[in-house]
């Protein structure tokens, strides 16, 4: 039996579209999500929050939550 995360795939798609829509450059935001996912994977290797959540999904959720802070999406 496979365990399913309690996250809805449509919700993840909505969050990623929201994140991409707010970004001025789709490539840069994609790279930033990938870097955040890589950091999450190395830092939270044995995380007890939700071990079934993939690092990329966690990064998308975190970054879409941080949309209120423009420095996350601005081109530095």
Curated annotation (Swiss-Prot):
<dbReference type="GO" id="GO:0006351">
    <property type="term" value="P:DNA-templated transcription"/>
</dbReference>
<keyword id="KW-0240">DNA-directed RNA polymerase</keyword>
<dbReference type="GO" id="GO:0000428">
    <property type="term" value="C:DNA-directed RNA polymerase complex"/>
</dbReference>
<keyword id="KW-0808">Transferase</keyword>
<comment type="similarity">
    <text>Belongs to the RNA polymerase subunit omega family.</text>
</comment>
<dbReference type="InterPro" id="IPR006110">
    <property type="entry name" value="Pol_omega/Rpo6/RPB6"/>
</dbReference>
<comment type="subunit">
    <text>In cyanobacteria the RNAP catalytic core is composed of 2 alpha, 1 beta, 1 beta', 1 gamma and 1 omega subunit. When a sigma factor is associated with the core the holoenzyme is formed, which can initiate transcription.</text>
</comment>
<keyword id="KW-0804">Transcription</keyword>
<protein>
    <recommendedName>
        <fullName>DNA-directed RNA polymerase subunit omega</fullName>
        <ecNumber>2.7.7.6</ecNumber>
    </recommendedName>
</protein>
<dbReference type="InterPro" id="IPR036161">
    <property type="entry name" value="RPB6/omega-like_sf"/>
</dbReference>
<dbReference type="GO" id="GO:0003899">
    <property type="term" value="F:DNA-directed RNA polymerase activity"/>
</dbReference>
<dbReference type="GO" id="GO:0003677">
    <property type="term" value="F:DNA binding"/>
</dbReference>
<dbReference type="InterPro" id="IPR003716">
    <property type="entry name" value="DNA-dir_RNA_pol_omega"/>
</dbReference>
<comment type="function">
    <text>Promotes RNA polymerase assembly. Latches the N- and C-terminal regions of the beta' subunit thereby facilitating its interaction with the beta and alpha subunits.</text>
</comment>
<dbReference type="Pfam" id="PF01192">
    <property type="entry name" value="RNA_pol_Rpb6"/>
</dbReference>
<keyword id="KW-0548">Nucleotidyltransferase</keyword>
